[in-house]
């Protein structure tokens, strides 16, 4: 959905009027079903750390870790889970996801958003079933790779699809539905792990349900409408108008449809190869850098270190296995509740405000965690921490989770999905997902080794990065709240810093935007004149 009305160009940026359509029951249902794709990523992220701490799973696949846990702590308790095979199990999914999302951009542009979602769902079903029946480490990794292919495809296409079907005034709310379902998936995984913690083959019941969100996405792709943008791009103009009218709940979509058609006319002659080539020109460099860097920042908040390894972390600090798994459920519940706040307020307060506030909150929480662990382990050495201290650390981690869940979590997916023009969107969103999976792989592969080597310092490491993130959000990120997707590039062209990065292309973008503003204004005036004459 184009999202936006007449744009009034001012000296400082863009403001928007209203298109005729608004939030309808139909568009909410469509967004809800597509956002279920977030369950794929969420369930897998949530189940990974918990299943690793299940006794039967450890004995079968990671006997070295199990043996180390049974020994008296003579070395640092931070090193209990420092195991190469365990790190490969966690991070292999993200390596596969990185590969699949490179192909996802081609599939999305040529076969459509629906087909891409269907293929991603099918991969996830296959991966969940393979893991549920895994007999050895090799089979486990194959299942993880299949899951990675599914997550890569889903993560690339679902945010893009949501941005294209959502009305601009509610784009943030509906797009964050994806992140909300990621958090719901994490919570469900925590509940499943806790429920099966004492079962001999409970780990199979933890890994197997991963097929369920894949099935939901696959079946949903059969009934969801294709996005108007893709239909127009493929020459199905009238069908695109019909879908847009249904999404908007009104037949008066001329201005919005004109925006979509104009954007498609620019993008149509551009091949996928040209789309990738265009992305690396100065004209599109601001969006490219924003998209990639925000993925780096999202992962270097330390979020996946927490989500992957919450049970592992608390086990390392001396908590009993059941208590460690229960802590995961608590963290998951806080995650869901805080993401709901982002759903309600992202279109009210804007992206930058949430990133800045959330970044400061996360930084203080990481700093507190590092300092408390340094002080307490100096007191207790390799002995388990007292329950009161562990509970305090859990509370601080929940503060971190809440800050992330209404800021860098949802904005890390929302912002890249709304800043690219149609001709660069497939390649641009692919770059965002590649960045996300690349840095998720790095964190998944390295965190337990970092924890072993840096001890409490690993939390101070993430706190330092959070300071940098907040400063970048303050000075370098344009506010995209309420700005139509097709005109976000003009927002960058008028930004004090990105204007210089774009060079002469900035003036070209501003001139093109002014022409489109005039055209959209003329269409609306015609409509008003026609109504007045009736």
Swiss-Prot record:
Inducers of expression: By glucose.
InterPro entries: MFS_dom (IPR020846), MFS_STP/MST-like_plant (IPR044778), MFS_sugar_transport-like (IPR005828), MFS_trans_sf (IPR036259), STP/PLT_plant (IPR045262), Sugar/inositol_transpt (IPR003663), Sugar_transporter_CS (IPR005829)
Annotated compartments: Membrane
Cytoplasmic face residues: 1-21, 109-114, 166-173, 226-299, 350-352, 409-433, 478-534
Main location class: membrane
One example GO MF annotation: monosaccharide transmembrane transporter activity
Membrane topology, from the record: Multi-pass membrane protein
Keyword Transmembrane in record: yes
The keyword Membrane appears for this protein: yes
Cellular component annotations (GO), alphabetically ordered: membrane
Transmembrane intervals: 22-42, 88-108, 115-135, 145-165, 174-194, 205-225, 300-322, 329-349, 353-373, 388-408, 434-454, 457-477
Keywords: Membrane, Sugar transport, Symport, Transmembrane, Transmembrane helix, Transport
A Pfam short name: Sugar_tr
Extracellular side: 43-87, 136-144, 195-204, 323-328, 374-387, 455-456
Family: Belongs to the major facilitator superfamily. Sugar transporter (TC 2.A.1.1) family.
Function field: Active uptake of hexoses.
Name of the protein: H(+)/hexose cotransporter 1
Taxonomic source organism: Parachlorella kessleri (Green alga)
Taxonomic placement: Eukaryota, Viridiplantae, Chlorophyta, core chlorophytes, Trebouxiophyceae
């Amino acid at each position: 959905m184009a999202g936006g009305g007449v744009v009034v160009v001012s000296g400082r940026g863009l403001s928007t009027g209203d298109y005729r359509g608004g939030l309808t029951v139909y568009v909410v249902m469509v967004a809800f079903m597509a956002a279920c794709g977030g369950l794929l990523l969420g369930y897998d992220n949530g189940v990974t750390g918990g299943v690793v701490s299940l006794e039967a799973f450890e004995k079968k696949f990671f006997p070295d870790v199990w043996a180390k846990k049974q020994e008296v702590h003579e070395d640092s308790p931070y090193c209990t889970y420092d195991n190469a095979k365990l790190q490969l199990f966690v991070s292999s999914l993200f390596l596969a996801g990185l590969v699949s999302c490179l192909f996802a951009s081609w599939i999305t542009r040529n076969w459509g958003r629906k087909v891409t979602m269907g293929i991603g769902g099918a991969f996830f079903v296959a991966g969940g079933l393979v893991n549920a029946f895994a007999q050895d480490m090799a089979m486990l990794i194959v299942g993880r790779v299949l899951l990675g292919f599914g997550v890569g495809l889903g993560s690339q296409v679902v945010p893009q699809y949501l941005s294209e079907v959502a009305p601009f005034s509610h784009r943030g709310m509906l797009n964050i539905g994806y992140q909300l379902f990621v958090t719901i998936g994490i919570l469900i995984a925590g509940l499943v792990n806790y429920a099966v913690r004492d079962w001999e083959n409970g780990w199979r019941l933890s890994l197997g349900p991963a097929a369920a969100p894949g099935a939901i996405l696959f079946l949903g792709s059969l009934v969801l409408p294709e996005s108007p943008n893709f239909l127009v791009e493929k020459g199905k103009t009238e069908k695109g108008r019909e879908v847009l009218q249904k999404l908007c709940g009104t037949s008066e979509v001329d201005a919005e449809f004109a925006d979509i058609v104009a954007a498609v006319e620019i993008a149509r002659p551009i091949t996928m190869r040209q789309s990738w080539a265009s992305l690396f020109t100065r004209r599109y460099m601001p969006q490219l850098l924003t998209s990639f860097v925000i993925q780096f920042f999202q992962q270097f908040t330390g979020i996946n270190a927490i989500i992957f390894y919450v049970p592992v972390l608390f086990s390392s600090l001396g908590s009993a296995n059941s208590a460690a798994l229960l802590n995961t459920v608590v963290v998951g519940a806080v995650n869901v509740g805080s993401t709901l706040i982002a759903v309600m307020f992202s279109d009210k307060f804007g992206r930058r405000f949430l990133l800045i506030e959330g970044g400061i909150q996360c930084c203080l929480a990481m700093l507190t965690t590092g300092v408390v662990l340094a002080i307490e382990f100096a007191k207790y050495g390799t002995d388990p921490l007292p329950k009161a201290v562990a509970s305090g650390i859990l509370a601080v981690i929940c503060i971190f989770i809440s800050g992330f869940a209404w800021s860098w979590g949802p904005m890390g997916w929302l912002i890249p999905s709304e800043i690219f023009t149609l001709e660069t969107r497939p390649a641009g969103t692919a770059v965002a997902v590649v960045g996300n999976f690349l840095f998720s792989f790095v964190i998944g592969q390295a965190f337990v080794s970092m924890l072993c080597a840096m001890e409490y310092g690993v939390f101070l490491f993430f706190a330092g990065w959070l300071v940098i993130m907040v400063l970048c959000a303050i000075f370098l990120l344009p506010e995209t709240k309420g700005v139509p997707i097709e005109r976000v590039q003009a927002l960058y062209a008028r930004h004090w810093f990105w204007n210089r990065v774009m060079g002469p292309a900035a003036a070209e973008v501003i001139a093109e935007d002014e022409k489109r503003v005039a055209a959209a204004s003329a269409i609306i005036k015609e409509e008003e004149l026609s109504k007045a004459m009736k």
